[in-house]
Amino acid sequence: MLFRSGEQDLEVYSDFAASLTVLTTVLNDQYEGRATSDAGAKACTINQPWPIIKGESDMTYRSGSDEFGTILYGDNPSRNYKVGDKLEVIVSHCDPVVNLYDQMYAIRGDKVEAVWPISARGMSA
């Protein structure tokens, strides 16, 4: 298994952590209880379930549109994101997400170990 995405059963695959994420940036934080990011359906795929916000248990992600995502805060969020903050979302379905990008960054800890080209980018029919 190269990736474990959000759609795979967390209990069945508990030996593996999710390894495919999309890095997104907060664009709007003016409304209470939510923030807007620059990763919508075109960045994370329209397939459901929606992505999971990495490291955040009391927040949910919804696609606001093709270009924008909505981060919804629960009752006890660990933080409130501000404009410019970066966060990772664990995508729900790997194949269509990988197909959307020209390259992928292989990261271990905080270090980028490799940049892999995606030569079949956009080749799905």
What feature does the model see in each segment?
Residues M1-A125:
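Active-site anion/phosphate-binding pocket segments in diverse small-molecule metabolic enzymes
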